Curated annotation (Swiss-Prot):
It is found in: Mitochondrion. This is Uncharacterized protein C777.11. Keywords: Mitochondrion. GO terms for biological process: glutaminyl-tRNAGln biosynthesis via transamidation; mitochondrial translation. Its main location: mitochondrion.
Length: 128
């Protein structure tokens, strides 16, 4: 893969630089070609994107330097297989719609919210 070879604008050098070097317009153009995107029409938009990329790379390097030795299980995954048959189909979505079902049950949050809404609608517009 040519973009991983050590060169001035390689992805590997950009992401693994120690300390990380800021991405410039040349590196940004290289990354855009790498992922198949076009540059933005305005120079300001490109500069904002480059700034965000540089901030993200700096944060990534900071996270890599954190001491995580105290974490016993850093990545938890599902320990059981998912049965695709048990997932809801389109006509069967209603039991899975949490907010709609909570409104139907008229739980405490929704009861208080609806009471506040009713009280505010009873006030006259001239009342201060």
């Amino acid at each position: 893969m040519p973009f991983l070879k050590p060169s001035k604008v390689s992805l590997k050098r950009i992401l693994q630089g120690n300390p990380p070097k800021p991405i410039g317009l040349t590196e940004y153009g290289h990354l855009l070609r790498l992922v198949g995107l076009r540059e933005a029409d305005s120079k300001e938009e490109n500069e904002r994107t480059i700034l965000k990329l540089n901030e993200g790379i700096i944060q990534m390097h900071a996270i890599e330097r954190l001491d995580t030795s105290f974490i016993k299980e850093p990545f938890r995954t599902l320990n059981h297989a998912i049965n695709a048959e048990s997932l809801p189909s389109l006509p069967d979505q209603e039991p899975w719609n949490v907010f709609q079902n909570a409104k139907k049950r008229d739980g405490q949050y929704f009861a208080v919210y609806s009471k506040l809404k009713d009280d505010s609608s009873n006030e006259s517009p001239n009342k201060q």
